[in-house]
């Protein structure tokens, strides 16, 4: 009787522990070249996207939002739900609905953080001077572009700026906005990235335009004659120091001190604080006063 033919066994390859085709090989190279080739491009990208605004005064997230609202017809039309704007903006900005809505809030009239807001808002958009006053969800609020945005998009359809592909190459978006005034100096802007941060204060729109026209006529124009000092939101008093102002204008670096405004209500025997510096919040000030009272450094305060 013929014997059954044996099937040859396949050779068993050694276990690779998930390493395929040399994926686990160690490549040695100088740390300097590694940083130059990988880290430096990343650092430059986030610095230009987060820390330093472009010449039009906007970061990419701002520009993508405003351009989306412009394409939606919100420059002249009625307000629409903020959720609609956020959803449309995600075609240009893939960072998620929460980040987009936060950007819209900070550009809105209701948030009160800008001298000249770009978003005409309706509903609860919180307040920049309150840490605990949260804004409503995007499904409850409405928005459109403010009238000043006419000066941001003027002649944008006449090849005044370059257009680039969005993140998935399905749409075009402007690399800059054709602003008709120095918006980078009109509204305050802050940002932080890799090893670099910026905190640009705001200036009066009329004074900025007059100064720009004067510099065009005379490059040696003394800026301080038409632009004496920054103009901050909230209406605080500036503690003017000519040396500091000169340093800010000449180097772009320096600090300007602000003082809150108040009035004494004699009938109620209380102090009414009318405005506070834009770099702090009501809650921070209240907590600081409470600490001073507990330490015995401030007395005769019964309520706050």
Predicted regions and their residues:
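Catalytic phosphate-handling regions of large nucleic-acid enzymes and associated NTPases
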Residues: 2-252
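Gly/Lys-enriched N-terminal cap/neck module of very large, oligomeric protein machines
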Residues: 255-304
């Amino acid at each position: 009787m013929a014997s059954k033919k044996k099937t040859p066994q396949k050779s068993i390859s050694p276990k690779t522990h998930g390493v395929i085709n040399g994926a686990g090989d160690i490549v040695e190279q100088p740390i300097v070249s590694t940083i130059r080739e990988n880290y430096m491009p990343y650092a430059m990208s986030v610095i230009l996207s987060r820390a330093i605004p472009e010449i039009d005064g906007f970061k990419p997230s701002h520009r993508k939002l405003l351009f989306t609202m412009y394409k939606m017809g919100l420059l002249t039309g009625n307000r629409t739900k903020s959720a609609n704007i956020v959803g449309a903006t995600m075609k240009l900005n893939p960072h998620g609905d929460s980040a987009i809505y936060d950007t819209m809030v900070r550009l809105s009239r209701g948030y009160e953080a800008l001298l000249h807001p770009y978003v005409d808002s309706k509903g609860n958009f919180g307040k920049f001077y309150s840490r605990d006053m949260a804004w409503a969800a995007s499904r409850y609020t409405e928005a459109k572009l403010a009238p000043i945005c006419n000066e941001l998009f003027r002649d944008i359809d006449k090849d005044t700026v370059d257009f680039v592909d969005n993140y998935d190459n399905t749409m075009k978006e402007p690399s800059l906005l054709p602003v008709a005034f120095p918006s980078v100096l009109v509204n305050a802007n802050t940002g932080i990235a890799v090893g670099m941060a910026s905190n640009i204060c705001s200036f009066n729109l009329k004074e900025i335009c007059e100064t720009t026209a004067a510099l065009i006529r005379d490059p040696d124009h003394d800026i301080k004659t038409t632009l004496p000092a920054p103009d901050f939101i909230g209406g605080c008093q500036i503690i003017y120091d000519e040396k500091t102002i000169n340093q800010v204008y000449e180097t772009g670096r320096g600090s300007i001190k602000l003082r809150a405004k108040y009035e004494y209500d004699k009938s109620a025997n209380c102090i009414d604080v009318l405005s506070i510096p834009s770099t702090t919040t009501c809650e921070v000030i209240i907590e600081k006063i409470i600490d001073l009272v507990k330490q015995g450094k401030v007395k005769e305060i019964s309520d706050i």
